[in-house]
A protein has these predicted regions:
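Solvent-exposed alpha-helices and their adjacent loops that cap or buttress functional pockets
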Residues: 93-95, 118-119, 147-148, 155-158, ...
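Active-site segments that bind and position negatively charged phosphate/pyrophosphate groups
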Residues: 204-317
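ATP/NTP phosphate-donor binding region
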Residues: 2-99
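C-terminal charged capping/lid subdomain of soluble metabolic enzymes
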Residues: 14, 184, 286-368
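A glycine/threonine-rich phosphate-anchoring loop and its flanking beta-alpha core
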Residues: 9, 18, 114-206
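Glycine-rich beta-strand-to-loop/alpha-helix junction loops that act as flexible
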Residues: 73, 103-105, 246-247
């Protein structure tokens, strides 16, 4: 593929997503091309990003720069760190024409974007996602948020960036586990929206995971395109955007039960969540057997050892169920699950009693 570019158009802002290699080496030109003209920049970056990339970014931005480093951890995505960022912006007299640049994965992006969104009611924000997961998920759509002891992303805002720069070269520095995590979101997008794309993934899974450029670039592009179409129709998640949460009710409850530990990261939780949502759909005669088996086989090819028994036991069932009840999609006393009719056709108005969901989760431990 040539340089891939997608424009996101919403009521609250339009912005481009650039997908290619060597983008960071052309950062100065890109910022100028897309009218990112600021006198000061706060660059918030993940400490795991290779130092050479931070040096390149510093060299390309010939303005006043403040660097702020965080460890990428769900536990660090909190109000305390938001306050820390806001205090730095205030102490250095940032105004609304200045810019925050996030360089890292989804956690750093969420934290940075939320701080930018509430500082003087909105500061310019540029997202440079460095993980596959962030490039295909959190960098698109304007969701920002932080965690609380009550659950994940319960405090946040919708705030669109001015620009997203997805440089594929960053992915070369990631461990295989992180690539698999990002692939889980790509798989989710194909399952809810495009069977042809799902078939492409099934055919080329190893080439994608090994970051072969035409395949990984196409996968990122197609995945972003799916999310773009959904976000443009429903920016604030009133209706169709809820489909992007396929597997996430389960995923978030699995993460929360483990206290957002590194034992299970977000991408792995999403894959487990997809697996659970498909099994729930199949057991309730919503999803047909052929597509159910295609998805389950695909997940096994990704990581055959990824199952609930690896992380939980039956004694964790009550805690898992408890965290599903704080999901933002729920109404009254019922759990709203995003389920699947067939590959490419999800459904988002499926309400079940907590007791019914508890029985299902308990039975999963017998089947994994």
């Amino acid at each position: 593929m040539k340089n891939s570019k997608i424009f996101i158009n919403t009521k609250n802002g339009s912005y481009p997503i650039l997908i290619d290699s060597e983008l960071i080496n052309n950062l100065e030109k890109i910022l100028k091309l897309y009218s990112i003209k600021s006198s000061k920049y706060l660059i918030i970056f993940d400490k795991n990003v290779p130092k050479k990339y931070i040096r390149i970014i510093k060299k390309k931005i010939k303005k006043k720069i403040i660097l702020l480093k965080f460890l990428s951890s769900e536990k660090n995505k909190n109000q305390k760190n938001v306050d820390y960022i806001l205090n730095i912006l205030l102490k250095n007299n940032f105004n609304r024409n200045d810019c925050v640049i996030s360089v890292g994965g989804g956690i750093i992006g969420d934290l940075s974007a939320f701080a930018a969104s509430i500082f003087k009611r909105g500061l310019k924000f540029v997202n440079i996602p460095t993980t596959l997961l962030a490039q295909v998920d959190s960098s698109i759509g304007g969701k920002t948020g932080i965690n609380t002891k009550f659950g994940k992303n319960l405090i946040g805002s919708f705030y669109q960036p001015s620009l997203v720069i997805s440089d594929i070269n960053f992915l070369k520095s990631l461990p295989p586990r992180e690539i698999i995590c990002g692939y889980g979101e790509i798989l989710k997008h194909s399952i809810i929206a495009n069977k042809k794309f799902f078939s492409f993934l099934s055919k080329n899974i190893m080439k994608i995971i090994k970051l072969k450029k035409p395949y990984i670039q196409k996968s990122i592009y197609e995945s972003c395109l799916i999310k773009k179409k959904i976000v443009e129709k429903d920016e604030k998640e009133k209706n169709i955007r809820k489909l992007l949460n396929f597997g996430h009710t389960f995923a978030h409850s699995y993460e929360a039960t483990l206290g957002y530990s590194k034992k299970l990261n977000h991408g792995e939780a999403v894959i487990l969540g997809i697996k659970s949502a498909c099994e729930f759909s199949f057991k309730n005669k919503i999803l047909n057997k052929v597509d159910y088996k295609l998805i389950q086989d695909h997940i096994i090819r990704i990581n055959k050892s990824l199952n609930l028994n690896k992380f939980f036991s039956k004694k964790d069932v009550n805690r898992i169920v408890k965290f599903t009840t704080v999901d933002k999609k729920n109404i009254s006393e019922k759990i709203n699950l995003i389920l699947l009719k067939k590959i490419g056709k999800p459904t988002y108005k499926n309400f079940y009693k907590v007791s019914y969901l508890k029985k299902f989760i308990k039975n999963q431990f017998n089947n994994n």
